[in-house]
Regions:
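Alpha/beta catalytic barrel-like cores
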Residues: 1-90, 177, 181, 209, ...
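Short, solvent-exposed loop/turn segments at secondary-structure junctions
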Residues: 72-74, 128, 218, 265
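Active-site loop segments of alpha/beta catalytic cores
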Residues: 64-67, 85-199, 213, 217-219, ...
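Short helix-terminating capping/connector loops at secondary-structure junctions
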Residues: 59-63, 113-118, 157, 206, ...
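Catalytic-face loop-and-helix region of soluble metabolic enzyme cores
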Residues: 181-294
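Noncatalytic linker/hinge segments flanking ATPase motor cores
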Residues: 17-29, 104-113, 159-169, 203-209, ...
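Glycine-rich anion/phosphate-binding loops
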Residues: 36-53, 91-107, 231-239
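Alpha-helical structural signal in soluble globular domains
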Residues: 54, 111, 150, 154-158, ...
Length: 294
């Protein structure tokens, strides 16, 4: 069966008080996050510690390093209480969940900052695809943006950039109108849906926002098998042309504010396809650098 949080008993309320004490110690009394409950361990975050090991080897030509964590909306709408009600709807528990995720992201930022490279932390928000649907009818845009504002702050005040990744279609204005630095989206499948928000996109880019342009497919194996660098490059150039036209911004200014990325993660793919996705990403990026950037 599905696990849930038992919010009705006394033990939960004791735990909640303890959580806020730990939170206050970390945020107001400068307790070292590494000594707090917000520090991850190898059992909970094996991939993160593998990344740190690789960074210790100081491989050449790294320009930045990126962490990732479940976003507050996806977490708080996915975790339920004993009545199968999402904890997002319980204001006190939602507040604790947002602070919990924000401080784990802050801990990640501190760990990644040791390598003297620019740090980016992404919040993964697949649930945003459901915003505005009947399932989330009572959740307001302001509530969502307040959650983003808080988690962004924990990371940004430590000198890192934040991103929000959604691998489906979404109301992109929520991210574009927030203080998030980077919008990460599946440009392979949903580019036309993003263009609907051209005004928000223009404002976002003009205030220095960046786009992680997921032009390399990861969702359908047939797409991965079929695609090559030239196809994806020409798809990208068409999209760039369209974005420049719709936002009234120059292609060169847009090119300075984008990253070429896979459309989503490769964790569900076999190794051969995962490696192809990464080499396509590198190949498309190199081709754009050599042929488009002045």
């Amino acid at each position: 069966g599905q696990e849930y949080i038992q919010t009705a008993n006394e033990e939960f309320h004791t735990d909640l008080v303890e959580f806020y004490e730990e939170y206050m110690a970390a945020t107001e009394n400068n307790k070292d996050l590494n000594e707090s409950k917000f520090a991850l361990d190898n059992k909970r975050a094996r991939g993160f510690f593998t990344l740190l090991e690789k960074l210790e080897e100081r491989p050449e030509a790294i320009n930045a390093v990126k962490g990732q964590i479940t976003g507050p909306i996806t977490f708080a709408t996915g975790v339920k209480d004993q009545n199968k009600k999402a904890i997002f709807y319980e204001e006190q528990i939602r507040d604790a969940a947002v602070k919990h995720l924000g401080l784990i992201a802050a801990w990640q930022t501190e760990q990644l900052s040791k390598y003297n490279l620019p740090v980016i932390v992404f919040f993964d928000e697949p649930a945003l695809a459901g915003f505005g649907s009947s399932e989330f009818i009572s959740i307001s845009k302001k509530e969502v943006m307040d959650c983003f504002s808080e988690v962004n702050e924990y990371v940004q005040q430590r000198g890192a950039l934040t991103g929000i990744h959604v691998c489906a279609n979404a109301d992109w204005s929520i991210i574009l109108d927030s203080e998030t630095n980077i919008l990460s989206f599946d440009a392979y499948s949903f580019f036309d849906k993003l263009l609907i928000f051209s005004d928000s996109l223009q404002n976002f880019l003009q205030k220095g926002g960046q786009i992680a342009w997921g032009i390399v497919p990861t969702q359908e194996k047939e797409d991965i098998d079929r695609e090559n660098i030239d196809n994806l490059y020409s798809r990208f150039t068409e999209q760039l042309e369209q974005l420049a036209k719709d936002t009234n911004l120059s292609k060169q200014s847009i090119l300075r504010q984008i990253y070429i990325t896979p459309s989503c993660g490769t964790g569900s793919l076999d190794r051969e396809r995962a490696e192809k996705v990464l080499s396509l990403t590198r190949g498309v990026s190199d081709k754009i650098r050599s042929e488009l950037i002045l």
